[in-house]
């Protein structure tokens, strides 16, 4: 059990640091587009979870520590629904209703499409 906990922890640290770095970089370059960082990591995370899920389906021998470290740890740290929700509320509170609705729709449907695309890539 300890190796599994360590794998998830290490993946979580790596994913969280990547999300933090992405947010800092986007906010430094496009401060008025704060929501872009969350959108980017969520879409990329959805693509990656599709790819990993597809790979793990055809490679059942991949150890649970690797699977959990990447999916639960890394992608769990990288992606975030709570930040998406806060970004949407901030846009609504600033009166940018159309942008908030577009952002929410793109996040949900873009995430679903990216997950499907990632899974499909593993079937080529």
UniProtKB/Swiss-Prot annotation:
Keywords of this entry: Cell inner membrane, Cell membrane, Ion channel, Ion transport, Membrane, Metal-binding, Sodium, Transmembrane, Transmembrane helix, Transport
One Gene Ontology BP term is: cellular detoxification of fluoride
Q: Which GO terms describe its cellular component?
A: plasma membrane
| Activity modulation comment | Na(+) is not transported, but it plays an essential structural role and its presence is essential for fluoride channel function.
Query: Does this UniProt record's set of keywords contain Phosphoprotein?
Result: no
Q: Superkingdom, according to UniProt?
A: Bacteria
Please report the record's description of how this protein sits within the membrane.
Answer: Multi-pass membrane protein
Q: What is the reaction catalyzed? A: fluoride(in) = fluoride(out)
Q: What is its main location?
A: membrane
Q: Name one Pfam family in it.
A: CRCB
Query: Any idea where this protein resides?
Result: Cell inner membrane
What does it do? Fluoride-specific ion channel. Important for reducing fluoride concentration in the cell, thus reducing its toxicity.
Q: By its UniProt entry, which HAMAP family does this protein fall under?
A: FluC
Name the UniProt record assigns to this protein: Fluoride-specific ion channel FluC
Supply the source organism for this entry: Pseudomonas fluorescens (strain ATCC BAA-477 / NRRL B-23932 / Pf-5)
């Amino acid at each position: 059990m300890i190796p599994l906990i360590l794998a998830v922890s290490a993946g979580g640290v790596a994913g969280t640091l990547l999300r933090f770095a992405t947010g800092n970089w986007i906010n430094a370059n496009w401060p008025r587009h704060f929501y872009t960082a969350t959108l980017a990591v969520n879409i990329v995370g959805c693509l990656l979870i599709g790819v990993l899920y597809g790979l793990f389906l055809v490679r059942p021998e991949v150890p649970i520590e690797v699977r959990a470290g990447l999916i639960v740890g890394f992608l769990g740290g990288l992606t975030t629904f709570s930040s998406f929700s806060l970004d949407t509320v901030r846009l609504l509170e600033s009166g940018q209703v159309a942008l908030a609705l577009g952002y929410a729709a793109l996040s949900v449907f873009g995430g679903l499409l990216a997950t499907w695309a990632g899974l499909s890539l593993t079937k080529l």
